[in-house]
Amino acid sequence: MHWADFTAEKLSKERGNKQVACSGITPSGEFHIGHIREILSAEMIHRACLDAGLDSRYIFIVDSMDPLRRVYPFLSQEYEKYIGCPLAFIPAPDSDGNPDPNGLSYAEYFLGPFLDALAEIGVFPEVIMNHETYSSGQFAEKIDSAIEQAEEIREIIETISGRELDVNWFPYKPLGSDGSMDGVTVTGYEKPFVHWTDRHGKSGSSDIRKAEGKLPWRIDWAARWGIHGITCEPAGKDHGAAGGSFDTGLPICKLLGSEPPSKMVYEWIQVKGAGPMSSSSGNTVGPIEALNLVPPEILRYLIAGSKMNRHIDFNTGSALFQMADEYERLVSDPPNPDNEDLTKRQRVAAITQSGAMRLSQIKRGSDPVDSLAGVTFRHLAMLAQIKTSDDDVWNSLRISGHLSGKPNSALQNRLERMRNWIGSIHFPEDARINIQKEIDEN
């Protein structure tokens, strides 16, 4: 059984018919392809739940209440004054990296292109901006409960994580007079107001029913599980490691009066030969860049064809040919689990491969054959190099019998991505065709 189908079956037994799959992201800068694994893992489990007849939603929580943590290289030093302020409440950068007060918010600016990229791979989540959940008062009950049980939560975090919290630690971070959470000390609580003093010597009160502060991450995550009724949220191995935020979130969620999702951990995507993706290290391939090179169904197959607990080597070089070959072979000769000649191991593999093909399609329920566009990846790579115009490619495909009439949108999109790949640094040199433009008289 495919891992997504197995998870859907398990969720049905544990939580019943109603399921909420979730993933999320902090819109602090450019996203990398590593984020795609969490998102597609959750989305594929959601699809598997629907295929199993369950009532399922897929939500995507944007951590827009998270603060700007530092001035990133693409930002001007003017952003120094916004450190500690929620991303939803600070301006997006202009082309020079300066704050643009007339544009989008910082969170919206970086989120938009990412959602466009998700749409290209068939992911259409229900987007929830976390600052709106705070401003609507949905967090208020959880915040009050966390404050009233602060010592119990402190004990959970210190015992499970093995780290000692500061003596002034408080399970709520109010915004100070300058809109930043940094340098703010809580002085008291009278529901619904948290009283504070900030680094500027000013005093004030934050209303927990509004977006005037937020829960620390480990408590925020546990609280949202209950607020949104989340039953499934895959976590990266950093959060899912022993003592990590998932382990502390489970008992905190129960303490706050809700049932947490089962623990589900995925391995990271690594750039082949370069280690895990990391925004801070610069070791990234953006999802938009990847989609300009890789057919979306093959990008989905990269995730669908690997168990969640196995790391993935993301290679936009020669290995892309191999991945495309594997995908095309399975589509052209689909596995048949009902074949009586199969061994038990072969039948399990056939069921798993069938699930991977089903979940790799951009549109749920579509025929995988339609994604091939009538021509193999390798053949198109050859034609795209020796034919300078798209019309010449189409004519060649008509002559070879691969195409009759006009090319469909799938084939046109494939050729566009192929030309992008050939023109990029990622295309393997041993696959590059050098066309001699002049006859050598010697």
PLM regions and their residue ranges:
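N-terminal Rossmann-like or analogous alpha/beta NTP/dinucleotide-binding catalytic cores
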Residues: 1-154, 249-250, 256
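Catalytic adenosine-cofactor/nucleotide-binding cores of aminoacyl-tRNA synthetases and other
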Residues: 241, 246, 267-433
